[in-house]
Amino acid sequence: MTAYEHITTGTGEECGVFGAYDMDGRDVAASIYYGLFALQHRGQESCGIAVTDTFGQRKVLSRKGLGLVNEVFDEEELAKLKGNLGVGHVRYSTAGGTRVENAQPLVINYVKGTLAIAHNGNLVNAVELRHELEYTGAIFQTTIDSEVIAYHIARERLNTKTAEEAVKNAMKKIRGAYALVVSSPRKMIGARDPFGLKPLCIGKRENTYFLASESCAIAAVDAEFVRDVQPGEIVTITKDGIASDMSMALPEEQHARCIFEYIYFARTDSTIDGVNVYHARILAGKALAESYPVDADLVVGVPDSGLVAAKGYSERSGIPYGMAFHKNSYVGRTFIKPKQSDRESSVKIKIGRASCRERV
């Protein structure tokens, strides 16, 4: 394996990102914690929070670790994270390896200040860009393509007036599926890839703005869902409100949502690009019943992701819906384990077969 192959093994990163900016100066670490807790299904390998105080010295404080959100953070740790602007991340990797150095958010200190970046997605040209950066003197501390994005944003910031311009220029160089939440002094920036493959949405609670991978995380902090960030859109949140830049957007016919968000990754109580995930799975089950009718006594879903689709299949086919599998609730999501061997062993202890005499 070369120095570059390890960042492209597998399909990339299906993570969860969350950002919060309280214009009145209240600490946001607890809100980010609850937002990440609501996004835990998107990543169980590591997590992190980085915050800054926009009214003070603007020093970035961060805490990252391997494990679930409630394993890495407790009240004492959250109390140390003083700041009214911050970003958070939960990670599931199929690339880059399980090590704390690969946990996000990434905090970059450079001549213009400090950036904290949380990234969900995968770059198809990560190896090429990383190679170019290393040959110009860049030294990488991680094996994830998120650091490639961070380097490009930091370098572009040297030649731009604003951080959002730097994000836009970086987007012109990177290719792939991504959603970004970036904090810089006194502003929070969200960006979505031009195809709209990875979700990102905006929420608001009183004078606090939020960015999140899914709307369920907005609801978890008692905020109001404002809207989705559009494919190719860059949103900049400051004390003056939300500014939008659509110059990277593609025509709507070129948008390409990730179907796996609706099938597996997203929570059923989330709505992505105007489509409720629960409803999408019901419709998928009905479509399957129309395309592939069967002679059976019972329709059974494999918990948890297959349960709603099975209900849709039952409704359309007229075959009763029932349970034939027992799920061990103490085992996490199995598909997002980093290794195939881990997934196989986890499935064995996660799913038990109930006694069932019907044809399923």
Q: Each PLM stretch: what is its role?
A:
Residues 138, 159-160, 293-297, 315-324, ...:
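Secondary-structure transition/capping motifs at alpha-helix termini
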Residues 300-309:
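Glycine-rich phosphate-binding loops at beta-strand->alpha-helix junctions
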Residues 318-359:
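Short, glycine/charge-rich flexible loops or terminal/linker lids adjacent to PRPP-binding catalytic cores
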Residues 1-231, 236-296, 302:
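Conserved short alpha-helical segments that host acidic/polar catalytic motifs at enzyme active sites
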Residues 148-161, 311-333:
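Amphipathic alpha-helical
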Residues 192-193, 309-312:
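A short acidic (Asp/Glu
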